[in-house]
Amino acid sequence: REDYLAADHVAPSDYAIQHRGVVETHLSGLRLTRERRVVISYFSMAPYLLPGTDLIFTVTRHYAEHFAEILPLAIIDSPIDYPVVQFYQLWHERMQHSPTHRWLRTLVGEMRRSRPGPQPA
């Protein structure tokens, strides 16, 4: 665990002081910190920064497996148990009854339910 925390990490920038990412929030609750060597504005940039480095990017297994299929990346279990990440669909109230928007929300929900792993509540 100490090696993991001391290693160089790629981390997304905090949304705001009171709105940090899942990893930082969880570590803070455990009174732990990690070495945030590279801070990025766009989460999707991180996997492309990793090949050829010893940088660590802590993400969900599903996300890691997707990028390991297209980039030379190693997936290693974290020595710290992180909570299950919950994803939500949010939309403006004026789109609530839009047929095309309802279709898209249904499609996204069906795709999520068809994937292995923890399911939404």
Placement of each model-derived feature along the sequence:
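Hydrophobic residues within well-ordered alpha-helices
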Residues: 4, 48-51, 89
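Short, solvent-exposed coil/turn elements at secondary-structure transition points
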Residues: 10, 15, 40-43, 79-81, ...
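Hydrophobic hinge/microswitch elements
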Residues: 15-75
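Short hydrophobic segments within beta-strands
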Residues: 10-12, 58, 90
